[in-house]
Amino acid sequence: MSDTVFCRKYQKELDALPFPPLPGAKGQEIQQTVSKQAWDEWQALQTRLINEKHLSLLDPDARAYLMEQMERFLDNRETDQAEGYVPPSQ
């Protein structure tokens, strides 16, 4: 695996993930097409969604919802946001 990938979210070469973040073919696809930066940003959004929407990862519907939101995020489409979340000022 190379140290960089052409990131589908940012449309440029960025640092690669060191290992597939999910099992199976989906994890391999993500490792080959998503940068570490984009994955880290997705994980932060995922954490906010789980916490604010009180999602249980034991619930298949919640897992399907998160997979849908992940695809939307990585494809630069609109995603749900945690209610009341205000990003830190830069």
Swiss-Prot record:
InterPro entries in the cross-refs: Fe_traffick_prot_YggX, Fe_traffick_prot_YggX_sf
| Alphabetical UniProt keywords | Iron
**Quick check: keyword Iron in the entry?**
yes
Q: What is this protein called?
A: Probable Fe(2+)-trafficking protein
Q: Which HAMAP family match?
A: Fe_traffic_YggX
Q: Please, which domain of life does this record's source organism belong to?
A: Bacteria
**GO terms of biological process kind:** cellular response to oxidative stress
Belongs to which family? Belongs to the Fe(2+)-trafficking protein family.
Its Gene Ontology molecular function terms?
iron ion binding
Q: Which PANTHER family does this entry report, sorted A to Z? A: FE(2+)-TRAFFICKING PROTEIN-RELATED
What is the stated purpose of this protein? Answer: Could be a mediator in iron transactions between iron acquisition and iron-requiring processes, such as synthesis and/or repair of Fe-S clusters in biosynthetic enzymes.
Q: Name one Pfam family in it.
A: Iron_traffic
- Report the GO terms under cellular component: cytosol
